[in-house]
C-alpha cells in the first residue's frame, strides 16, 4: 500500500520558539543591570520573557518606565503555581511565579518580567508605586494564589467572597464541585456571612466624616439597571457630588481560568465565547490563535478571511447594543428597539453560517468547524445594503441631539497619561489621540490585507467621544465585511496539520492512522508541545488576550485571560471623583462592558 500522507511534522513550524535576545530592550537591561542579572526564557509568546530577582523588581520596572521610548502600560499582572510543572529546563527554581506584562506604545513592543517565589516565602513588593492599575491585579493574584504584595494599599479578596477559604488557582485546590464536601449553611455560618456584608467605610479605603462634616454612603447595584450586570459601586457622597467610590466586582466569577486546566485544548473553545458573552467569535480568536502558536499551525487564507468576517459581524453586533443602550442610559428609549432589529439580522446571518447565534463555538484549532454554506454571500449582501442607512438615522436622530451632547460631552474625561496608567484600551484609549488598534499595530488573521481606518479622538476621552468613535468603528467594520464578501479566497477550511482538531474528515475515511488520531484528539484532546504562547486581539471592548502555558499535555497547565472590561472598571474612581451621581450613570454607559468579561 502506498502511503500518500505527508510528513507534516518535518515541516518548518509556523511559530518558532524564540528568546528575543535581538530585542533592543534586552541590550538596554544588560547595559544597566549586567549580563547575569536575569534569565531570558525562550517561548512562543512573541515577546521577550525575562526572569528577574525579586529585589530588583521595582528598580527594573522604574527603569523600563523611564527609557527614551518607555514601557508606559502595565498590560497584565498575575501568577502561576509552578509546583507541578515538569518542563522547566533552564528556568530559575520556583514554586510560584508572578509575571508583569508591559507595553511600549512608542516601540510597539512588549516585555514580560517574571519573579520566582518559594512556597515558604510568597512575598513580592507591590507594583502600585509604579503603575496604579497594579492594584486590582495584585488583589486578584493574592485572592487566587495567596501571593502577598508587600505595601499594597488594600490587599483583600476581589473575586471570591471575603469569607472564602483557600486560593482557588493553586494546583492543590479542587477544580470540581464533586471534590468538595456537601455545602451546609449553619446558623453560625449564616451570621458570619451577614456580618461580612456589613459596610464599613474604612475597610474599603474610605474616610468617615469629621465633627464638621459627614458623608452619605450609597450602594449602586449589584442589581441596578444602569450597572449593566451584577456590579456594585459604593459611593461616598457630599450631597450629589461623588467624593469617592469603590467598585465591587466578582459576583459573576465562574473560575474560567481554572476550567482551562481541566478541559482539553479543543473542548475549552465553548468557554471562550462566554468570557464576554456579546463578542461571540471575537473571543474565540485569541484563544485559537494562541493554541495554533503552540502547535505550529499556519491556517489557509480562506480560514483567515472567514475568521475576520465572523469577528467583524460580532463587533458590529456588540457596538449596536452599546450605542443604543448608551442612548437609553442618557434618556432616549426608541433607538434600542430599532437596534435590536439590526442585531437580529446579524444573528440570522451568524446562525446560517455557524448553526448558532450568540455563542457559536465555531472556530477550531487549525480552522473552522465547517465551510461556508450556500447563500452566505446573499445574506451578507442584504445586511451590508441595510445597515449604513440605519446607522445614519441613529446618528442624526439621537447622537447629534443637543440634550444627549450636553449630558455626555466633558463627562468622565481623561487624557492619554491617565488612560495608559490605568491600562485602558479600545475606544477609551484611542479617544485620547493614541492610535493603537491591534488589528493595525500587530495584525493577526490577515488583517494586514484589509483596507480600513482606525478612528482616533482629539486628545480628551469623554463619554461622547468614546461613543462616536464606536459609531465610526462600526462603519469601518462594514468596510471590512464588504472586502470579505468580494474577496473570499478559495481553498480548505482547515489546515493540513497533525494537530488540527478535529482532523480533516477526508483522511479519516481513507487512513486508519488518521482515524486513530481523530479518536484520540476528540476524546482525550490533542497534545500540545510544552511551551508558552500569547495572543492579543482587538476585541469589541478593547484588547483581549490569552497567555497559555503547556506542559506537554492534552490540557493547559495555565490559562490566563486578560480582559479589557476589568481594567476599565478599575479606572472608574479616578475618572468620576468630583462629578455628580447622574454623571456616573452616563459614564458607565460609555465604558462598554459586561460583567462576564470583568469577572471571568
From Swiss-Prot:
Its EC number is 7.1.1.-. GO terms for molecular function: NAD binding; NADH dehydrogenase (ubiquinone) activity; NADH:ubiquinone reductase (non-electrogenic) activity; quinone binding. Its main location: membrane. It is found in: Cell inner membrane. It is a peripheral membrane protein. GO terms for cellular component: NADH dehydrogenase complex; plasma membrane. Residues 1-190 are annotated as: NADH dehydrogenase I subunit C. PROSITE patterns: COMPLEX1_30K, COMPLEX1_49K. Residues 214-600 are annotated as: NADH dehydrogenase I subunit D. Keywords: Cell inner membrane, Cell membrane, Membrane, Multifunctional enzyme, NAD, Quinone, Translocase, Transport, Ubiquinone. It catalyses: a quinone + NADH + 5 H(+)(in) = a quinol + NAD(+) + 4 H(+)(out). Signal peptide: none annotated. In the N-terminal section; belongs to the complex I 30 kDa subunit family. NDH-1 shuttles electrons from NADH, via FMN and iron-sulfur (Fe-S) centers, to quinones in the respiratory chain. The immediate electron acceptor for the enzyme in this species is believed to be ubiquinone. Couples the redox reaction to proton translocation (for every two electrons transferred, four hydrogen ions are translocated across the cytoplasmic membrane), and thus conserves the redox energy in a proton gradient. NDH-1 is composed of 13 different subunits. Subunits NuoB, CD, E, F, and G constitute the peripheral sector of the complex. This is NADH-quinone oxidoreductase subunit C/D. The gene is nuoC.
Amino acid at each position: 500500500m502506498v502511503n500518500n500522507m505527508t510528513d507534516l511534522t518535518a515541516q518548518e513550524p509556523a511559530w518558532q520558539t524564540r528568546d528575543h535576545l535581538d530585542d533592543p530592550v534586552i541590550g538596554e537591561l544588560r547595559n544597566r543591570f549586567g549580563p547575569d542579572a536575569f534569565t531570558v526564557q525562550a517561548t512562543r509568546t512573541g515577546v521577550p520573557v525575562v526572569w528577574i530577582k525579586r529585589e530588583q523588581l521595582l528598580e527594573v520596572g522604574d527603569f523600563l518606565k523611564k527609557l527614551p521610548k518607555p514601557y508606559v502600560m502595565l498590560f497584565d499582572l498575575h501568577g502561576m503555581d509552578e509546583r507541578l510543572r515538569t518542563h522547566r529546563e533552564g528556568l530559575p527554581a520556583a514554586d510560584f511565579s508572578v509575571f508583569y506584562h508591559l507595553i511600549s506604545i512608542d516601540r510597539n513592543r512588549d516585555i514580560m518580567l517574571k519573579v520566582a517565589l518559594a512556597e515558604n516565602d510568597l512575598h513580592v513588593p507591590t507594583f502600585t508605586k509604579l503603575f496604579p492599575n497594579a492594584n486590582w491585579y495584585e488583589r486578584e493574584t493574592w485572592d487566587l494564589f495567596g501571593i502577598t504584595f508587600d505595601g499594597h494599599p488594600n490587599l483583600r479578596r476581589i473575586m471570591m467572597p471575603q469569607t472564602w477559604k483557600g486560593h482557588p488557582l493553586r494546583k492543590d485546590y479542587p477544580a470540581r464541585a464533586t471534590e468538595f464536601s456537601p455545602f451546609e449553611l449553619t446558623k453560625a455560618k449564616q451570621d458570619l456571612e451577614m456580618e461580612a456584608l456589613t459596610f464599613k467605610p474604612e475597610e474599603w479605603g474610605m474616610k468617615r466624616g469629621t465633627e464638621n462634616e459627614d458623608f452619605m454612603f450609597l450602594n449602586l447595584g449589584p442589581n441596578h439597571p444602569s450597572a449593566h450586570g451584577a456590579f456594585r459601586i459604593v459611593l461616598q457622597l457630599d450631597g450629589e457630588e461623588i467624593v469617592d467610590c469603590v467598585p465591587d466586582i466578582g459576583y459573576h466569577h465562574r473560575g474560567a481560568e481554572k476550567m482551562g486546566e481541566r478541559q482539553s485544548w479543543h473542548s475549552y473553545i465553548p468557554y471562550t465565547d462566554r468570557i464576554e458573552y456579546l463578542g461571540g467569535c471575537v473571543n474565540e480568536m485569541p484563544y485559537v490563535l494562541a493554541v495554533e502558536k503552540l502547535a505550529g499551525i499556519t491556517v489557509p487564507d480562506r480560514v483567515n478571511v472567514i475568521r475576520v468576517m465572523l469577528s467583524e459581524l460580532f463587533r458590529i453586533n456588540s457596538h449596536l447594543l452599546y450605542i443604543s443602550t448608551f442612548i437609553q442610559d442618557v434618556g432616549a428609549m426608541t433607538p434600542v428597539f430599532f437596534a435590536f432589529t439590526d442585531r437580529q439580522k446579524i444573528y440570522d446571518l451568524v446562525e446560517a453560517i455557524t448553526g448558532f447565534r450568540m455563542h457559536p463555538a465555531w472556530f477550531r484549532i487549525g480552522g473552522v468547524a465547517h465551510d461556508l454554506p450556500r447563500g452566505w454571500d446573499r445574506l451578507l449582501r442584504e445586511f451590508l445594503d441595510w445597515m449604513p442607512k440605519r446607522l445614519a438615522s441613529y446618528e442624526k436622530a439621537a447622537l447629534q441631539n443637543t440634550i444627549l451632547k450636553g449630558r455626555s460631552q466633558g463627562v468622565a474625561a481623561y487624557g492619554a497619561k491617565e488612560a495608559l496608567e490605568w491600562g485602558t484600551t479600545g475606544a477609551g484609549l484611542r479617544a485620547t489621540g493614541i492610535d493603537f488598534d491591534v488589528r493595525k499595530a500587530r495584525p493577526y488573521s490577515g488583517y494586514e490585507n484589509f483596507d480600513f481606518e482606525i478612528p482616533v479622538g482629539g486628545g480628551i476621552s469623554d463619554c461622547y467621544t468614546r461613543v462616536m468613535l464606536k459609531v465610526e468603528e462600526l462603519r469601518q467594520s462594514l468596510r471590512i465585511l464588504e472586502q470579505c464578501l468580494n474577496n473570499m479566497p478559495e481553498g480548505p477550511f482547515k489546515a493540513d496539520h497533525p494537530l488540527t482538531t478535529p482532523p480533516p474528515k477526508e483522511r479519516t475515511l481513507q487512513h486508519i492512522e488518521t482515524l486513530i488520531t481523530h479518536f484520540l484528539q476528540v476524546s482525550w484532546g490533542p497534545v500540545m508541545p510544552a511551551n508558552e504562547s500569547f495572543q492579543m486581539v482587538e476585541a469589541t471592548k478593547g484588547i483581549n488576550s490569552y497567555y497559555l502555558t503547556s506542559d506537554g499535555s492534552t490540557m493547559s497547565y495555565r490559562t490566563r485571560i486578560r480582559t479589557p472590561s476589568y481594567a476599565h472598571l478599575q479606572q472608574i474612581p479616578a475618572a468620576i471623583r468630583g462629578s455628580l451621581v447622574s454623571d456616573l450613570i452616563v459614564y458607565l454607559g460609555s465604558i462598554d462592558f459586561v460583567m462576564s468579561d470583568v469577572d471571568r
